[in-house]
Amino acid sequence: MQLVLAAKYIGAGISTIGLLGAGIGIAIVFSALIQGVSRNPSLKDTLFPFAILGFALSEATGLFCLMISFLLLYAV
C-alpha cells in the first residue's frame, strides 16, 4: 500500500512539470507584446487581443497539468 501511495505522489509531482512550460510560455507571449508595442506603439490595440489569446492558451495547458495532478492525488 505504501508503494502505491508513493507512486501517486511521484506521478503528481511529475505531472506538475507542465506548469513550468506554461509559465515560460506566458513570459514569452508578454515579452513579445512589450517588444511589439515598443517598436510600434500604434499597434497596441491590435496586438493586445492576440497576447490575451496566447496567454489563455498557455494558461490552459498549465491548468490541464494541474488538474491531472489533482486527479492523481485525490481520485485514483
UniProtKB/Swiss-Prot annotation:
It is found in: Mitochondrion membrane. GO terms for biological process: proton motive force-driven ATP synthesis. Pfam families: ATP-synt_C. SUPFAM superfamilies: F1F0 ATP synthase subunit C. The keyword ATP-binding does not apply. Mitochondrial membrane ATP synthase (F(1)F(0) ATP synthase or Complex V) produces ATP from ADP in the presence of a proton gradient across the membrane which is generated by electron transport complexes of the respiratory chain. F-type ATPases consist of two structural domains, F(1) - containing the extramembraneous catalytic core and F(0) - containing the membrane proton channel, linked together by a central stalk and a peripheral stalk. During catalysis, ATP synthesis in the catalytic domain of F(1) is coupled via a rotary mechanism of the central stalk subunits to proton translocation. This is ATP synthase subunit 9, mitochondrial. The lineage of its organism: Eukaryota, Fungi, Dikarya, Ascomycota, Saccharomycotina.
